[in-house]
Amino acid sequence: MSQHFPCYSAVFPLLLRERNGKREVLLHRRHNTGYMDGKWDIAGSGHVDEGETARQALARECSEELGICVRPEDAEFAHVCHRLGKEGDRTYYDLYFFVHAYEGTPAIMEPDKCDGLNWFALDALPEDMIDFRRLHLHQVLNGEVYDELF
């Protein structure tokens, strides 16, 4: 008989803007987290906590990590990746959402976990971005709604 395993969920708010004729995405650089430190990642991402929906988690994470207010109804589902854990890593459902509106100016609110915050043109993403986040971002922008990594 197969054994059920714990499966975690994480949310990824896609904050996009137009600047100088280029579309940009907001990324943060991970620091002192124990996971992919020094790599650029989707800004405001985080775990879904017990008892909250994915959109509620996204609003909470944006407030905690970026200091901005996102209403859950301003987050539009875009993509999910079922990411199977390897060698003891956790299995995740990564949920990506377009954020259509927010209040405030994004800032680093958790300097113990993040040491960089910047807008990057979609055609000039940093080389040291987490590889599979780059892949997912391109999939989202191409209208792909589901992926699996194993």
How would you describe each model-predicted region?
Residues 69-79:
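A short coil-to-beta-strand element that immediately follows conserved catalytic motifs
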Residues 1-26, 98:
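Conserved N-terminal beta-strand and adjoining loop/helix that marks the start
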Residues 8-9, 79-106, 140:
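Active-site-adjacent beta-strand/loop module that shapes the phosphate/pyrophosphate-binding cleft
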Residues 22-64:
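Conserved Nudix-box catalytic region and its N-terminal flanking loop in Nudix hydrolases
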Residues 107-140:
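NUDIX/MutT-family hydrolases
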Residues 144-150:
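Acidic/histidine-enriched, glycine/proline-rich intrinsically disordered or flexible terminal extensions
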